[in-house]
């Protein structure tokens, strides 16, 4: 029988380390006794005291106890819960340094996963404000027996526990400082321990809260929820099962929407996918339009189109746009948005873009000169493998995962006959390591 050497027990003594670099997740990298240690809360160039959290085979993990020599990029976190709450990971790093980290991450991912490099890096897209930007969020809810209270918020860093938050600096102001009040509201309901989450979705004029409940609500419960909505000017929705069970409780006839360039009203349900950062989204859509260089009457394919966030602005610019989406509800909302905005040059179809080949569909055989892709984190490998068959000359790819974008870029450049003209970072999620990326591809050979 093989005998494996026992790992050394975790030292409880503070350890000193010099921080050499940052991981893509924003942890400091150090070497102690010849072994790599990833240290939460530490920045490059700093000397810190830290304690070990856990030992792994090839690396250890730790957390800062004291910063002996701070880095020039270190700033005071605005949120009192930073370091405990897992919602943000970079509030201690200046916004300029955060952006630099994201740019380095994207460059490295392109090289590592795609073996490609853009001909030119675009200047990063950033918003004007770094606080209260989060228009969309999913809040955890938990009755904690030991504290005899209901907690509402994000999970603690590295834990499944809900952090006890007095407020959130990055959440939309309509909700950011209502977290304790939401906890008190749920504590007053008959099913206080059977509500696992609240979905937050803010429009331009109002904010909606979706209460997920695992058991039926009483009349008294719904009255409490309505009173809360009235007091704080919030739309209240209930969800007793899957996404199809979401229904508006109060006020009757209410809807959520946001404006695009003052010309379009985009209507959505609170559980629909919409971009987290409204200001940056507007800048992103504008840059996509610039890169695609739309000419009147040009046929454009919008894959993973959602409610039409890009489709409708493309139609306003004069393109004949076909939006494709795999979710029937989102397709219905996209069609409704085109009708609501009186656009007759935007069409929508439903298809599983990552499930099977789709070039045989009628809409795919009609031909497109340009295409836009905005896939989920898993990327769009099957879709990009079919781009050259469609003879698409120019592609803009918007991604929330630089690793899968890099993989798909490698496919387009190395096998589908495209060149990677431009790429750039979009800072959709300040104070976190999440990074949105945009890339432009042009066809180099005819098929």
Swiss-Prot record:
Active-site residue numbers: 400
Entry binding sites for [4Fe-4S] cluster: 79, 85, 88, 168
A molecular function GO annotation: iron ion binding
TRAM domain ranges (all copies): 7-66
Domain of life (superkingdom): Bacteria
UniProt keyword 4Fe-4S present: yes
Pfam family, one: TRAM
Catalytic activity of the protein: uridine(1939) in 23S rRNA + S-adenosyl-L-methionine = 5-methyluridine(1939) in 23S rRNA + S-adenosyl-L-homocysteine + H(+)
Gene Ontology process terms (BP): rRNA base methylation
PROSITE patterns: SAM_MT_RNA_M5U, TRAM, TRMA_1, TRMA_2
Entry binding sites for S-adenosyl-L-methionine: 275, 304, 309, 325, 352, 374
Family: Belongs to the class I-like SAM-binding methyltransferase superfamily. RNA M5U methyltransferase family. RlmD subfamily.
Function: Catalyzes the formation of 5-methyl-uridine at position 1939 (m5U1939) in 23S rRNA.
Protein name according to UniProt: 23S rRNA (uracil(1939)-C(5))-methyltransferase RlmD
Upper lineage: Bacteria, Pseudomonadati, Pseudomonadota, Gammaproteobacteria, Chromatiales
Gene name in the database record: rlmD
């Amino acid at each position: 029988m093989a005998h494996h050497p026992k790992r050394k027990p975790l030292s409880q003594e503070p350890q000193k380390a010099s921080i050499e670099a940052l991981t893509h997740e924003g942890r400091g990298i150090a070497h102690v006794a010849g072994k790599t240690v990833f240290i939460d809360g530490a920045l490059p160039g700093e000397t810190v005291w830290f304690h070990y959290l856990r030992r792994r085979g090839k690396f250890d993990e730790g957390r800062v106890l004291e910063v002996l020599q701070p880095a020039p990029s270190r700033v005071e976190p605005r949120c009192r819960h930073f370091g405990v709450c897992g919602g943000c990971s970079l509030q201690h790093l200046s916004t300029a340094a955060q952006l630099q980290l994201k740019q380095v991450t994207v460059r490295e991912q392109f090289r590592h996963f795609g073996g490609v490099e853009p001909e030119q890096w675009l200047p990063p897209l950033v918003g004007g404000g770094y606080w209260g930007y989060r228009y969309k969020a999913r809040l955890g809810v938990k009755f904690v027996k030991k504290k005899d209270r209901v907690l509402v918020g994000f999970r603690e860093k590295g834990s499944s526990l809900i952090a006890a938050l007095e407020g959130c600096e990055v959440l939309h102001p309509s909700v950011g400082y209502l977290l304790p009040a939401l906890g008190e509201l749920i504590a007053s309901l008959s099913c206080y321990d059977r509500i696992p989450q609240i979905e937050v979705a803010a429009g331009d004029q109002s904010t909606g809260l979706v209460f997920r409940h695992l058991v039926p609500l009483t009349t008294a419960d719904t009255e409490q929820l309505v009173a809360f909505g009235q007091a704080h000017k919030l739309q209240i929705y209930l969800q007793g099962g899957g996404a199809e069970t979401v229904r508006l409780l109060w006020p009757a006839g209410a809807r959520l929407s946001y404006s695009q360039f003052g010309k379009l009203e985009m209507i959505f349900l609170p559980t629909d996918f919409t971009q987290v950062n409204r200001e940056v989204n507007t800048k992103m859509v504008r840059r996509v339009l610039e890169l695609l260089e739309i000419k009147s009457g040009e046929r454009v394919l919008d894959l993973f189109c959602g409610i039409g966030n890009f489709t409708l602005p493309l139609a306003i610019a004069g393109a004949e746009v076909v939006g494709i989406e795999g979710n029937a509800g989102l397709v219905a909302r996209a069609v409704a948005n085109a009708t609501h905005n009186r656009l007759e040059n935007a069409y929508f179809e439903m298809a599983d873009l990552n499930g099977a080949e789709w070039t045989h569909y009628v809409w795919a055989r009609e031909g497109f000169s340009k295409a836009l892709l905005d896939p989920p984190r898993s990327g769009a490998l099957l879709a990009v493998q079919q781009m050259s068959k469609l003879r698409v000359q120019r592609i803009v790819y918007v991604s929330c995962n630089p690793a899968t974008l890099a993989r798909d870029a490698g496919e387009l450049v190395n096998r589908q006959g495209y060149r990677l003209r431009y790429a750039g970072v979009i800072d959709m999620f300040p104070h976190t390591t999440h990074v949105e990326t945009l890339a432009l591809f042009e066809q180099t050979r005819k098929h």
